[in-house]
Amino acid sequence: MGIVVQKFGGTSVANEESRARLVAKVIEARHDGKDVVVVVSAMGRKPAPYATDTLLDLVGSVCLTAPPRERDAIAACGETISTVVVAAALEAAGCPAVSLTGGQAGISTDSNYTDARITKIEPRRILEVLSDGKVAVVAGFQGVTERGDVTTLGRGGSDTTAAALGATLGAEIVEIYTDVEGVMTADPRVVPEARFQDTMSYTDLIEMANQGAKVVHLRAVEIAMHSRIPLAIKSTFSDSPGTLVADVAPRAVATFAPPRVVSAVTTVAERTQLVLQGDLYSDTGSVLGVFSTLADQRISVDMINVFPDRIAFIVASREAAAAVETLKELGIDAETNPGCAKVSVVGEGMRGVPGVMARVARALHDAAVRVLQTSDSHYSISCLVPESDMERAARALHAQFELGK
């Protein structure tokens, strides 16, 4: 029998009603003749008692500077609890299941606590469970080091667990179940005209994740792409087929229409622009020093523009004060421009196509949106705009590239 990996997020395991829907999805796959590996996240979101942030607060209330190793040890408890609850729910429905922690499932990681990388997976225990005719319910988001210490994989780590298990087990597909019915052309809270996409490429989903879309974790999509494992993004709460992510999006009928240049618009709010004045460009060491020092402080930098007389980039607004202080220690004064947002158009189809930037500029100009900064790659164009203009900018770009049709 083929193997299917099904990952269920926090809202899918949060209460009895959602867990009943989860159980139905698993039983349906088994009725289709599949061996099923279930990956689960912690139950619900803060202030739910077993949500990751709630558990971390237990440590934070005792020691604000708790070592990362200890934070990982308690953060991983949420997923471990979920595995037992879900396995019990499956058993109660007549579907035999075994709960496994990340370590029991054979997931090994490096020692980068709170943001560990999977180094290898030994799936022997999972395969034993499947060969016994049972469902393996695996804790997402966690693994163990060579010394046996528990680690976590960073936010979105359960997606990574599911993709890595799918690749290791040679799964037919990895199904990511969430509270939305698939990948949309934009955040519907920002662009009401956004629509669901039936199919899309790995490249487009990776670029969406790079530009801030919180659909599937970036590492998970990269693993799936490199392993050529299809991903299906579905809702636990509906029977919609969701969005299929694969090498070549299959179509029910032949089509001779040109591919879309842009497949989605993404938005990221609460950004602060930092501008460093001076002739830093002539001193490569100074430029490298700025960004390496910020990286050492774990401050993420985006939209970097280097000019002869200045450097401009953005950081999350919550990290702006720390970034300014770090730069002061280097003897560099930073001009800050808070209250910004990044709006991006994403699409594998734009590579090598002339005029995309012109269309972006025209749409934003016509919408009276002030552009503070731009950056681009082969598959995306990003514009920094005042946060107050973010929705207007996103809607203008969505309309410009006819993504609602």
Regions found by a protein language model. Name each.
Residues 1-221, 384-386, 401:
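Nucleotide/pyrophosphate-binding catalytic subdomain
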Residues 41-56, 233-252, 308:
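Terminal amphipathic helices with adjacent charged low-complexity linkers/tails
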Residues 43-44, 180-182, 227-231, 235-240, ...:
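Glycine-rich beta-alpha junction loops
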Residues 130-145, 208-232, 277-278, 284, ...:
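Electropositive, surface-exposed helix/loop patches at the edges of structured domains
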Residues 139, 192-197, 207-268:
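Phosphate/diphosphate-binding glycine-rich loops and adjacent basic-rich segments that engage nucleotide
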Residues 173-177, 231-233, 302:
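Short hydrophobic alpha-helical runs that function as membrane-insertion/retention elements
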Residues 242-405:
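A conserved regulatory-domain signal marking ACT and ACT-like small-molecule sensing domains
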